[in-house]
């Protein structure tokens, strides 16, 4: 594992913890059903881009999914800035981060197996932008196709909601 990756921290359900220590229970509804949403922004020269607007969009997704995370948008902005601040020293000059918030409905207990309802899972992370890995697309171009299977129609699920269901994009990469 990259030494810097080993040092990154994330916000996880109320605490700033080592990123490597974040664990999602297998009964988390996002893992089971894709029942969650996210938003991402990035930094430019270390400065986060339109964080408030991205968090507002996150809260629109949360409202659509009827998930209450018991945090205000301003608190999520503050948490996001804290995560970025604690990870900024790990970047080389000229490098930047993705800064993202990932929310799920959390664990929903079923039956008597000993699991408790957890409430929402809230994670805020920084991930290095990997321009070097994508540079060849800009230099050489890439082939594209129009798939025969389309995304979920907007009558079924609002395309304005950034949900955890990106399986169609995963399939396109295979």
What are these regions (language model features)?
Residues 1-174:
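Conserved alpha/beta cores of soluble small-molecule-handling proteins
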């Amino acid at each position: 594992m990259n030494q810097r990756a080993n040092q990154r921290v994330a916000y996880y359900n109320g605490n700033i913890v080592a990123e490597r220590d974040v664990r999602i229970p297998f009964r988390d509804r996002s893992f089971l059903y894709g029942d969650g949403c996210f938003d991402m922004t990035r930094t430019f020269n270390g400065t986060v881009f339109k964080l408030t607007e991205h968090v507002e969009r996150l809260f629109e997704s949360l409202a659509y999914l009827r998930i209450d995370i018991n945090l205000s948008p301003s608190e999520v902005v503050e948490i996001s800035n804290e995560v970025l601040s604690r990870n900024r020293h790990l970047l080389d000059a000229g490098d930047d981060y993705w800064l993202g918030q990932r929310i799920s409905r959390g664990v929903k207990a079923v039956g008597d197996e000993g699991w408790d309802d957890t409430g929402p899972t809230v994670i805020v992370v920084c991930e290095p932008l990997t321009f070097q890995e994508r540079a060849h697309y800009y230099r050489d171009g890439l082939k594209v196709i129009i798939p025969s299977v389309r995304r979920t129609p907007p009558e079924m699920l609002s395309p304005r909601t950034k949900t955890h269901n990106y399986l169609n994009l995963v399939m396109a990469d295979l």
